[in-house]
Curated annotation (Swiss-Prot):
<dbReference type="GO" id="GO:0010446">
    <property type="term" value="P:response to alkaline pH"/>
</dbReference>
<dbReference type="GO" id="GO:0050262">
    <property type="term" value="F:ribosylnicotinamide kinase activity"/>
</dbReference>
<comment type="pathway">
    <text>Cofactor biosynthesis; NAD(+) biosynthesis; NAD(+) from nicotinamide D-ribonucleotide: step 1/1.</text>
</comment>
<keyword id="KW-0511">Multifunctional enzyme</keyword>
<dbReference type="GO" id="GO:0009435">
    <property type="term" value="P:NAD biosynthetic process"/>
</dbReference>
<dbReference type="InterPro" id="IPR038727">
    <property type="entry name" value="NadR/Ttd14_AAA_dom"/>
</dbReference>
<dbReference type="InterPro" id="IPR041749">
    <property type="entry name" value="NMNAT_NadR"/>
</dbReference>
<protein>
    <recommendedName>
        <fullName>Trifunctional NAD biosynthesis/regulator protein NadR</fullName>
        <ecNumber>2.7.7.1</ecNumber>
        <ecNumber>2.7.1.22</ecNumber>
    </recommendedName>
</protein>
<keyword id="KW-0547">Nucleotide-binding</keyword>
<dbReference type="InterPro" id="IPR016429">
    <property type="entry name" value="NAD_NadR"/>
</dbReference>
<feature type="binding site">
    <location>
        <position position="104"/>
    </location>
    <ligand>
        <name>NAD(+) 1</name>
    </ligand>
</feature>
<dbReference type="InterPro" id="IPR014729">
    <property type="entry name" value="Rossmann-like_a/b/a_fold"/>
</dbReference>
<feature type="binding site">
    <location>
        <position position="77"/>
    </location>
    <ligand>
        <name>NAD(+) 1</name>
    </ligand>
</feature>
<comment type="function">
    <text>This enzyme has three activities: DNA binding, nicotinamide mononucleotide (NMN) adenylyltransferase and ribosylnicotinamide (RN) kinase. The DNA-binding domain binds to the nadB operator sequence in an NAD- and ATP-dependent manner. As NAD levels increase within the cell, the affinity of NadR for the nadB operator regions of nadA, nadB, and pncB increases, repressing the transcription of these genes. The RN kinase activity catalyzes the phosphorylation of RN to form nicotinamide ribonucleotide.</text>
</comment>
<keyword id="KW-1003">Cell membrane</keyword>
<dbReference type="Pfam" id="PF13521">
    <property type="entry name" value="AAA_28"/>
</dbReference>
<dbReference type="InterPro" id="IPR001387">
    <property type="entry name" value="Cro/C1-type_HTH"/>
</dbReference>
């Protein structure tokens, strides 16, 4: 590789032509071309400085120690973080290269206990968010499609990664890994010294496979930015005075986690003076958006499971009941937010007037319950009915349902 390959990479990243770079740097295009190809034995320091200044590069260029970490990060865990933190403190610049292969990644998901498959952007986001304050870390995605899965296919993979690093201008001095068996392979195929970090897992005994098989068992090893992805969501539905809010609070207490309150009630107080008489069609999208924000907050800080008081189907049902039509924005959120467990409470508990309820008759309550069921089925949402009439039995039944759901990963 030429000693000026980094300049070629910088020019490519700028998106400039050689003529534009030459003009801006006070040299001819021919001189620049010869310079980039190391044909000029003693290039002008003044021209080099102008070129570096135009490209936003340091001059004179200081020799940097470059490190690289390879991984799938499927998912990112604290073992990865320990490796990366150790590596980035030993080099001037650390490149994290995340490999992805749609076929392989799909197979890993299907053989796991994960409730959803992480996308490539999900995995990149975990890395970017976790290391966003460390300016010497660079993150890349490398397509490994068609390459034999690890630990096979070293020849094909090494040729691919060499080409990828050359395109990105990455010239590593060191590779960091916790996999003892990989060190000689890296040296043989890439010719780069490898530094082993905690290969015996004495400090951080965890692997991506363990988390994929049982996320909740290894919850403490899942980073803060990754945990929301694994959180299970439980939505409690029902008509007015069915005990949803109290039940959600009790469940969140017993499972030591977060809950999302029904935003519609807060909206009525903050925007309508505490009286639904002023509610109109144009309010429903705002109510749905506010509820989505409550849900996102609850999921972000949840301990394995988050409980949701009322879903968007219920919001849509009220819109249809009072306004005679459905709202497209609410429907979009119905499609976007799918919960792991939906519990529909039967309307067979005493109706309590609280100033915000208007469907108190047995006929109204039954009609609304039927509307909920109809809309859940229309949207292909699976749900479990809880028909116990006393509050304690309802609570115990819901605890049982949640434990069954969580038991898949315990």
């Amino acid at each position: 590789m030429s000693s000026f390959d980094y300049l070629k990479t910088a020019i490519k990243q700028q998106g400039c032509t050689l003529q534009q770079v030459a003009d801006a740097s006070g040299m001819t295009k021919g001189y620049l071309s010869q310079l980039l190809n190391a044909k000029i034995k003693s290039p002008s320091a003044q021209k080099l400085e102008a070129l570096h200044r135009f490209l936003g590069l340091e001059f004179p260029r200081q020799k940097k120690t470059i490190g690289v970490v390879f991984g799938k990060f499927y998912p990112l865990h604290t073992g990865h973080i320990y490796l990366i933190q150790r590596a980035c403190s030993q080099v001037d610049e650390l490149h994290i290269i995340m490999g992805f292969d749609d076929t392989r990644d799909r197979a890993l998901f299907e053989d796991s206990a994960m409730s959803q498959q992480p996308t490539v952007p999900d995995r990149l986001r975990w890395l970017l968010q976790t290391f966003k304050y460390q300016k010497n870390i660079r993150i890349h995605a490398f397509n490994e499609e068609g390459m034999e899965p690890y630990p096979h296919g070293w020849d094909v993979w090494s040729n691919g990664i060499k080409k990828f690093m050359a395109e990105k201008g990455i010239q590593p001095d060191l590779i960091y890994t916790s996999e003892e068996a990989d060190a000689p392979q890296y040296m043989e195929h890439l010719g780069i010294e490898t530094v082993l970090v905690d290969p015996k897992r004495t400090f951080m005994s965890i692997s991506g496979a363990q988390i994929r098989e049982n996320p909740f068992r290894y919850w403490e090893y899942i980073p803060t930015e990754v945990k929301p992805f694994f959180v299970r969501t439980v939505a409690i539905l029902g008509g007015e005075s069915s005990g949803k809010s109290t039940l959600v609070n009790k469940l969140a207490n017993i499972f030591n986690t977060t809950s999302a309150w029904e935003y519609g009630r807060d909206y009525v107080f903050s925007h309508l003076g505490g009286d639904e008489i002023a509610l109109q069609y144009s309010d429903y999208d705002k109510i749905a958006l506010g509820h989505a924000q409550y849900i996102d907050f609850a999921v972000k800080y949840a301990n394995k499971v988050a409980f949701i008081d009322t879903d968007f189907v219920t919001t849509q049902a009220f819109c249809k009941k009072y306004e005679g039509r459905e709202h497209p924005f609410v429907q979009a959120l119905i499609d976007e937010y799918r919960f792991d467990l939906v519990i529909l409470l039967e309307n067979n508990t005493p109706w309590v007037a609280d100033g915000l309820r208007s469907l108190g008759s047995s006929v109204d309550r039954k009609e609304f319950q039927n509307l909920l069921v109809e809309m859940l089925e229309e949207n292909n949402i699976e749900f479990v009915r809880v028909e116990e009439e006393d509050y304690d039995s309802r609570f115990l039944r819901c605890v049982e349902l949640v434990r069954e759901m969580m038991g898949e990963q315990r």
